[in-house]
């Protein structure tokens, strides 16, 4: 599990990756783990200030968490943790 005591801000639940995100990561020659670690530590990536503030609120109120990252080849990816913390999913924006 990637939840690291003292670093992870929340329980990620089960990790899931969509076929599109898995293919995009493979095409970019990258792995999801660094992005998942960033998400779990509160580094929300390429989110605007308003969405980062929404995540801060969501942490305190057990709401959905969103991160957005750009892979080395320019592909946009999202990571979403469900409000009930049952699952964290790596996906492409068009798979939402």
Regions found by a protein language model. Name each.
Residues 59-96:
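Short, compact, well-ordered microdomains
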